[in-house]
């Protein structure tokens, strides 16, 4: 089957934003204008097409990033049909993992900001993730019809808070209730959308006289930004020649692809204004799969030779699984992005990460939670496969005869855990199955059994994250669970270097004995300097410990790191240097050296000024001005460090760093302090030494 849409007319984009910027409504409008959806689904009444889990519709927030395919030929039907694959990404900080994994497979992104709230803390997190994957992006300033809407103020915040170079493509005509349309700064015309047909048709008109001067000024800014794309254009511009519309668009596109500028559009998705022109900007300025660098990977040749795959149907098949979802009707759905080649339903592919072959039974293209079965997918496509058995998020799928392992994704460590137990014994097995499935879907969610208490522990990125997991167990798997108190993921570390710590394990009373003897130095590592949080240096000279026992010493220490001597929490940022010891020809063994190493570690750890580390969260609270004092006082009582505050249209934004252990139940307290008028967001920032009294209480509670 031949390709129906040339790859140059593909756009794989994400729609990304903070909570309440109106991202889901924006996506709904995209689906409406591209002709997929004939009745607009509003978030207000829980009917939005992209929010397809029940909890999302109840809570009005987007949890799972659903992928949808749509076609767009332009507002004035000025293009050949372009295939736009949209990945909707959640804005809540507990679901940062969803944003991270969608950024990994996108070619471009639309950042949605609220014209009133502007750039929020969550916007900064998403921005950093987009920077990490070098995703070209444009911005859409939404909610121009709301009280306090100010387009140019948000443009200023994109520059100041995100360190970006924003270039407005449009200006808003009016604001709040008086918002009627936009000025197109490329064409220098006003665009007015027709309210009678929900904005499907529009007219170009003259720029309102009172805006002409402002429009000229920002048009000049746009032309200058375009001219900076090349010396040739700059010479033309400085020579006083006019740049053509085509030259402007081509130059700006190049600068967006190079991540040098962020083009900014505006509108009100709710009022059916602006989304249409933003879609045109997606086509004009965001990359096709062929515009972004080839994907890197490693060949399976025993030497890990670097290789790459280009967005080309003729190259061998390669794809990345970026999301696993459980569908009530068909079981496992594996969402994947094809980077190169072609695959047909019925084909067998290799998962080199698991060394397992998988058969593509059925391939579907998703429209939110509706699906259309297709026979093949090609380079640039995003689709879902039904029935893949052992694939997890981040795995590669490739041609078995041309094996490549694509770059893996990075997933954060959970910061909060709770114990869960089924309400009835009969649910025990069902709960295990449910948690296993959910963990497969979500790599930032972990499940394990506590060896001491035999309880099932679940861990994730925040209270809301775990609430939703428990909720999904009940809804999707019919398992009711009792939930324990949230537990903080503390860590242990040392603060000073200790040298010549000896560990000896010797049992030599006739027959074959046991003998292992090590001498080590222990030292703290700079936090974050080593991704594993541990380094082992073998400095043995003259064979005082034979080479075959060295790995056992390393292993003995690593086993101790899982549960530190202070309170049984994992040990991080530790370096160990093995430099002396002794062995016995007959009695030495790997086990003896493992035990000797663990004895040395325990002794050294106590002497090296051990500390308990607690997770510190970056907290931002938006509150009405009259409640500022109460909110700050409450954060201080929670051992919060204030990092500044600023005023905005709706009140005051307070920035603070607060230990996670002090933030449980904060939402309820904030509601009562401000009569429900404040909101907050929180994300993990760093680990820091817990004060003595806190550390003591934690250690005592752990019964150490």
UniProtKB/Swiss-Prot annotation:
Record has Metal-binding as a keyword: no
Subcellular location: Cytoplasm
PROSITE patterns on file: G_TR_1, G_TR_2
Origin species: Pectobacterium atrosepticum (strain SCRI 1043 / ATCC BAA-672)
Family designation: Belongs to the TRAFAC class translation factor GTPase superfamily. Classic translation factor GTPase family. EF-G/EF-2 subfamily.
SMART domains found in the cross-reference section: EFG_C (SM00838), EFG_IV (SM00889)
Domain of life (superkingdom): Bacteria
Protein name: Elongation factor G
Entries under SUPFAM superfamilies matching the protein: EF-G C-terminal domain-like (SSF54980), P-loop containing nucleoside triphosphate hydrolases (SSF52540), Ribosomal protein S5 domain 2-like (SSF54211), Translation proteins (SSF50447)
């Amino acid at each position: 089957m031949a390709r129906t849409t040339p790859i140059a007319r593909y756009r794989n984009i994400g729609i990304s934003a903070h909570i309440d910027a109106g991202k889901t409504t924006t996506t709904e409008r995209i689906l409406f204008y591209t002709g997929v959806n004939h009745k607009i689904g509003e978030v207000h009444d829980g009917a939005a097409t992209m929010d397809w889990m029940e909890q999302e519709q109840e809570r009005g927030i987007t949890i799972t990033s659903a992928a949808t395919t749509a076609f767009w030929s332009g507002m004035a039907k000025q293009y050949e049909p372009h295939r736009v694959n949209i990945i909707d990404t959640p804005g809540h900080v507990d679901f940062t993992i969803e944003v991270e994994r969608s950024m990994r497979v996108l070619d471009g992104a639309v950042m949605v900001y609220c014209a009133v709230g502007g750039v929020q803390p969550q916007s900064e997190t998403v921005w950093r993730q987009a920077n990490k994957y070098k995703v070209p992006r444009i911005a859409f300033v939404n909610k121009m019809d709301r009280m306090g809407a100010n387009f140019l103020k948000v443009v200023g915040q994109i520059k100041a808070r995100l360190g970006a170079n924003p270039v407005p493509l449009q200006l808003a005509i009016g604001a709040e209730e008086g918002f009627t349309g936009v000025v197109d700064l490329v064409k220098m015309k006003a665009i007015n959308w027709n309210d009678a047909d929900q904005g499907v048709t529009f007219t170009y008109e003259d720029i309102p006289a009172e805006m002409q001067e402002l429009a000229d000024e920002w048009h000049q800014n746009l032309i200058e930004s375009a001219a900076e794309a090349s010396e040739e254009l700059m010479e033309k511009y400085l020579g006083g020649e006019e740049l053509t519309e085509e030259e402007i668009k081509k130059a700006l596109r190049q600068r967006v692809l190079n991540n040098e500028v962020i083009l900014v559009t505006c509108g009100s998705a709710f009022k059916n204004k602006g989304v249409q022109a933003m879609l045109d900007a997606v086509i004009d300025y965001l990359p096709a799969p062929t515009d972004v660098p080839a994907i890197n990977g490693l060949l399976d040749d025993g030497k890990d030779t670097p290789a790459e795959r280009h967005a080309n149907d003729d190259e061998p098949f390669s794809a990345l699984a970026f999301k696993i979802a459980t569908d009530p009707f068909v079981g496992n759905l594996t969402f994947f992005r094809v980077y190169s080649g072609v695959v047909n339903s019925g084909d067998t592919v290799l998962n080199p990460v698991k060394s397992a072959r998988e058969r593509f039974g059925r391939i579907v293209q998703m429209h939110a939670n509706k699906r259309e079965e297709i026979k093949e997918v090609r380079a640039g496509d995003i689709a879902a496969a039904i029935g893949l058995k052992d694939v997890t998020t981040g795995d590669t799928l490739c041609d078995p005869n041309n094996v490549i392992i694509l770059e893996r994704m990075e997933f954060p460590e959970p910061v909060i855990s709770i114990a869960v137990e089924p309400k009835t014994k009969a649910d025990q097995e069902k709960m295990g199955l449910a948690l296993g499935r959910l963990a497969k879907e979500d790599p930032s969610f972990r499940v394990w059994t506590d060896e001491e208490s035999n309880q099932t522990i679940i861990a994730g990125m925040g209270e809301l994250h775990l609430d939703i997991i428990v909720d999904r167990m009940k809804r999707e798997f019919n398992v009711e669970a009792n939930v324990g108190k949230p537990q903080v993921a503390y860590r242990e570390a040392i603060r000073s270097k200790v040298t010549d710590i000896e560990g000896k394990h010797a049992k030599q009373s006739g027959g074959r004995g046991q003998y292992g003897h090590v001498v080590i130095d222990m030292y703290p590592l700079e936090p974050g300097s080593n991704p594993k949080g541990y380094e082992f240096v073998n400095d043995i000279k003259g064979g005082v410990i034979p080479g075959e026992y060295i790995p056992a010493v390393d292993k003995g220490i690593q086993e101790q790191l899982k549960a530190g001597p202070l309170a049984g929490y994992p040990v991080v940022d530790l370096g160990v240097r093995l430099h002396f010891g002794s062995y016995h020809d007959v009695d030495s063994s790997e086990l003896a050296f493992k035990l000797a190493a663990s004895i040395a570690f325990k002794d050294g750890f106590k002497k090296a000024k051990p500390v308990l580390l607690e997770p510190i969260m970056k907290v931002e609270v938006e509150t009405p001005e009259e409640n500022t004092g109460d909110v700050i006082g409450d954060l201080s009582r929670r051992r919060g460090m204030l990092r500044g505050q600023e005023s905005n249209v709706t009140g005051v934004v307070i920035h603070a760093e607060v230990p996670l252990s002090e933030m449980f139940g904060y939402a309820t307290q904030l509601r009562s302090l401000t009569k429900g008028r404040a909101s907050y967001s929180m994300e993990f920032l760093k680990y820091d030494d817990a004060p003595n009294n806190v550390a003591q209480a934690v250690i005592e509670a752990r019964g150490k």
